């Protein structure tokens, strides 16, 4: 890191408008030689009002600035401290531009010689982090950040993380460090100087034995699993007793009963359905059952979960805790398909790719560091998104395996016999094919959160043709000899001529003409689809914010598909008899496109269920064509039911109408299931009230203003009485945003933070919601499950409408052919399940107290009300107007105290 001094700066401001907002706090942490050597901190007075959101975010109130200096009073002092330093900040543009503007207003010209963005550093140094938000980085790396969004603490935390990153860089093998230096020249800021100094000062030594080398890549040596050591002669009951005692948990007979039930089903190779509701301790129960089964039989068990979060919890928290508590060494491993694991040949190809793109360059640097760390080579560890993911997926699709390639999937296969517990998720479980030998090694499977299986199966059987994807894939080939793969082919042809390579001549001009025609044919195809949309009945899917066309003629689409497939075939003929690796890459890309079009063509010809989706009705580029290739029931039967000798489905919401029959109907094979119900140990009836307003008008689709106003009135009543946070669940974005707009205009919510669901931001929003004392979270179907609501006071969940999927929802359309009565057999059970999941957001432990408000009068007035009423049997129910609602809140508040 050298002897340079780094000024790590963080600012808090009244907003993000450079020309209108002011700095209200500055924190600077000075770093030299990987040590914090000094700090500076000051509140900054402003004549502007501090918005309520900023006050809530920073905990800085206007009275705290009354004795603080204005910036012009400390500007020279700050400038003198940082003028010779390397300027560092997290998301550096924001802080640098604000401080330069503030200096300029004081007639000080500040131009740092070097600038470092820690967002850039942390993406490279910590490639597997799920988020690069400062608070989440701090938590992930064990750094205490008590008051996020306070400049002094944020600056210190950023500095500590930067030191961690630099120390990590310095420990890397020299060859890796050199490659990082060369790649860093393409970054936005001055990180290349840092890498240069690290390379220059590197203490040369032989490559550590924990590493191996493939071509130019240094990677972590793979260490095979040892056979498991779990010598145990006792019963499951004694194993359970020891586990809960060592883990400091409460001994719960129902949890033991659940574990014993699972073990019994495994031992007898049975198929079972178990509804184990909230509080039954499913995870520990099935882990102990799987472990005991392995001890007694030597067989290993596959556990499939719904989310990556639960996967991580099992592998990184629950199983290590069990190992420590029981003094065992349980071999557990994440199991996926071959395409989910990296090969070093693929990384080598990516590093050699001359694509000039900032995100791709960051990805290359991330790969170099990640491969020195990862024991598994699981690509999802990288959490790729956006352009990086599209680029990476394309590279996988077109990768031609290198000779002597090192593929991490082979390591997983080699060690599968020594695995006691395999962890996977529903998507991989359903996606795995017959040739996937890892899954074939498991005879027994436990499926947690089994009620979600149909959704993953539907995704699996639905094929998609997207304008954006095809345009991107074609762009990777290029239109002329100066672009992408065409450029590589052009260079190969020149090399053939100059060096007299032993390959056939390549018709570059013919290839270029063919590619231009393919581009034009693709435009014609999507123009045809665009015309169909404009001439058809279009239905809004408000949940997913798309417009759908369900009924349309496919004749013109098939004509265009045939033309583009024919042209792709003729283009592929250009490369007949040529086996050079550059040609193979282009052929593979063309074959990928051909297969994409061909699969859609075959499905449409066969009359499979299809629909067209468009995000923006005026933009052809947002079109997607979907075709359902197989029945969900067929896939669930083949990929799940028939794959294992013993199979146990577990969920808190597996039953409908007091029966498991609805779930059984998801399989098209008549198989006997043993069924069990494990009641929760939480006394939800004592803790939870369900309030059904009697003064809210019935929902009217064409006029929802009155309905929305009623919801807002109840939110006001709740927050006024309790000053607590509230989760409001909607079935449409339209209604959610109407409520949001009204809340933001009302003075009652000036000291509240109103958070709204945003695409790809759910994790961040949930964290914010749980951190604020006064917050209202507005969300749609995503938040009906899998969301841990944390609050110190009363907890409240308001359900705007019962969670029925709209008749014009794509799921409804795609599943319609699989049921005699789609509403009764699919839509109604799905709505009841989601409603039950929504109720489950409230009471997460024995100490929780709260209230559920359901505004939809169909809960008590519809023909199917009894199905929902069954879900409320364990809750105290109350009907009344808003005054009675307030009275109930005061009673609950009194009990909470």
UniProtKB/Swiss-Prot annotation:
GO biological process terms, semicolon-separated: DNA replication proofreading
Enzyme Commission identifier(s): 3.1.-.-
Keywords: ATP-binding, Exonuclease, Hydrolase, Nuclease, Nucleotide-binding
InterPro entries in the record: ATP-dep_Helicase_C, DinG, DnaQ, Exonuclease_RNaseT/DNA_pol3, Helic_SF1/SF2_ATP-bd_DinG/Rad3, P-loop_NTPase, RNaseH-like_sf, RNaseH_sf
Domain Helicase C-terminal per the UniProt entry, residue ranges: 703-893
PROSITE patterns the record matches: HELICASE_ATP_BIND_2, HELICASE_CTER
Motif (DEAH box): 448-451
Domain Exonuclease positions: 8-161
Domain Helicase ATP-binding span(s) in chain numbering: 241-496
GO molecular-function term, one example from the UniProt record: DNA-directed DNA polymerase activity
Matches recorded under Pfam families: Helicase_C_2, RNase_T
Catalytic EC class: hydrolase
GO cellular component annotations of the record: cytosol
Residues the record lists as binding ATP: 276-283
Family affiliation: Belongs to the helicase family. DinG subfamily. Type 2 sub-subfamily.
Record's function text: 3'-5' exonuclease.
Name this polypeptide is given: 3'-5' exonuclease DinG
Gene source species: Staphylococcus aureus (strain NCTC 8325 / PS 47)
């Amino acid at each position: 890191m050298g002897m340079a001094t780094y000024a790590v700066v963080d600012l808090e401001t009244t907003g993000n408008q450079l020309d209108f907002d002011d700095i209200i706090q500055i924190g600077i942490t000075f770093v030299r030689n990987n040590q914090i050597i000094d700090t500076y901190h000051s509140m900054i007075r402003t004549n502007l009002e501090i918005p309520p959101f900023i006050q809530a975010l920073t905990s800085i109130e206007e009275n705290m600035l009354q004795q603080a200096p204005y910036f012009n009073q400390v500007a020279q002092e700050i400038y003198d401290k940082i003028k010779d330093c390397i300027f560092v900040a997290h998301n550096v543009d924001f802080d640098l531009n604000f401080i330069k503007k503030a200096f300029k207003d004081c007639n000080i010209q500040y131009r740092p010689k070097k600038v470092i963005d820690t967002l850039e550093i942390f993406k490279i140094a910590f490639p597997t982090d799920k988020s690069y938000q400062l608070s989440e980085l701090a938590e992930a790396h064990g750094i205490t950040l008590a008051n996020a969004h306070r400049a002094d603490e944020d600056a210190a935390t950023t500095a500590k993380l930067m030191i961690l990153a630099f120390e990590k860089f310095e420990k890397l093998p020299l060859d890796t460090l050199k490659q990082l230096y060369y790649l860093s020249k393409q970054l936005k800021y001055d990180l290349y100087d840092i890498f240069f100094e690290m390379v220059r000062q590197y203490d040369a030594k032989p490559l550590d034995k924990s590493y191996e080398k493939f071509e130019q890549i240094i990677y972590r040596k793979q260490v095979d699993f040892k056979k498991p050591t779990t010598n145990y002669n006792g019963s499951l009951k004694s194993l359970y007793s020891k586990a809960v005692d060592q883990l400091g948990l409460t001994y719960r007979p129902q949890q033991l009963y659940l574990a014993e039930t699972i073990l019994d089903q495994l031992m007898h190779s049975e198929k079972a359905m178990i509804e184990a509701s909230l509080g039954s301790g499913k995870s520990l129960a099935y882990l102990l059952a799987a472990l005991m089964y392995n001890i007694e039989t030597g067989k290993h068990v596959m556990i499939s979960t719904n989310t990556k979060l639960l996967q991580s919890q099992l592998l990184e928290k629950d199983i290590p805790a069990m190992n420590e508590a029981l003094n065992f060494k349980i071999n557990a491993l994440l199991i996926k398909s071959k395409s989910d694991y990296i090969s070093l040949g693929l990384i080598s190809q990516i590093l050699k790719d001359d694509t000039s793109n900032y995100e791709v360059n960051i990805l290359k640097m991330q790969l170099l560091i990640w491969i020195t760390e990862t024991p598994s080579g699981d690509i999802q560890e990288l959490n790729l998104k956006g352009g990086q993911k599209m680029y990476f997926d394309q590279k996988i699709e077109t990768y031609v395996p290198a000779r002597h390639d090192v593929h991490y999937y082979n390591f997983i296969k080699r060690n599968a016999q020594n695995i006691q517990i395999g962890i996977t998720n529903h998507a991989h479980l359903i996606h795995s094919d017959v040739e996937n030998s890892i899954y074939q090694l498991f005879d027994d499977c436990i499926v947690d959160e089994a009620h979600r299986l149909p959704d993953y199966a539907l995704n699996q059987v639905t094929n998609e043709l997207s304008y954006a994807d095809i345009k991107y894939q074609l762009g990777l080939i290029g239109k002329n000899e100066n672009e992408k793969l065409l450029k590589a082919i052009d260079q190969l042809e020149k090399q053939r001529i100059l060096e007299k390579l032993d390959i056939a001549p390549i018709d570059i001009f013919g290839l270029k003409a063919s590619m231009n025609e393919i581009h034009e044919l693709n435009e014609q195809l999507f123009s045809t689809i665009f015309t169909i949309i404009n001439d058809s009945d279009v239905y809004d899917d408000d949940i997913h914010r798309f417009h759908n066309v369900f009924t349309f003629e496919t004749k013109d689409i098939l004509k265009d598909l045939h033309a583009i497939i024919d042209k792709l075939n003729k283009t592929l003929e250009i490369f007949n008899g040529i086996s050079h690796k550059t040609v193979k890459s282009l052929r593979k890309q063309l074959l990928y496109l051909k297969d994409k079009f061909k699969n859609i063509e075959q499905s449409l010809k066969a009359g499979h269920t299809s629909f067209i989706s468009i995000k923006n009705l005026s933009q052809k580029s947002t079109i997607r064509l979907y075709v359902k290739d197989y029945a969900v029931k067929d896939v669930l039967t083949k990929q799940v039911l028939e794959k294992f000798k013993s199979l146990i489905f577990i969920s808190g919401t597996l039953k409908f109408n007091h029966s498991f029959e609805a779930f059984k109907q998801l399989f098209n094979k008549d198989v006997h299931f043993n069924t069990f119900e494990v009641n929760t140990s939480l006394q939800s009836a004592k803790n939870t009230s369900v309030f059904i307003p009697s003064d809210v008008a019935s929902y009217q689709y064409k006029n929802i203003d009155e309905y929305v106003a009623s919801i807002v009135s109840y939110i006001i009543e709740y927050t006024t009485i309790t000053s607590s946070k509230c989760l409001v669940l909607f079935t449409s974005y339209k209604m959610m945003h109407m409520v949001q707009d009204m809340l933001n205009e009302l003075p009652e919510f000036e000291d509240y933070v109103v958070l709204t669901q945003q695409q790809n931001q759910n994790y961040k929003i949930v964290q914010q919601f749980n951190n604020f004392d006064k917050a209202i979270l507005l969300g749609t179907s995503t938040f009906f499950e899998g969301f841990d609501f944390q609050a110190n006071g009363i907890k409240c969940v308001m359900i705007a409408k019962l969670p029925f999927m709209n008749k014009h929802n794509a799921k409804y359309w795609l599943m319609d052919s699989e049921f005699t009565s789609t509403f009764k057999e699919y839509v109604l059970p799905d709505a009841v399940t989601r409603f039950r999941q929504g109720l489950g957001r409230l009471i997460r432990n024995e100490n929780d107290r709260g209230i559920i408000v359901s505004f939809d009068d169909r809960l008590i007035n519809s023909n199917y009300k009894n199905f929902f009423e069954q879900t409320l049997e364990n809750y105290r129910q109350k009907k009344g107007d808003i005054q009675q609602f307030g009275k109930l809140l005061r009673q609950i508040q009194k009990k909470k105290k």
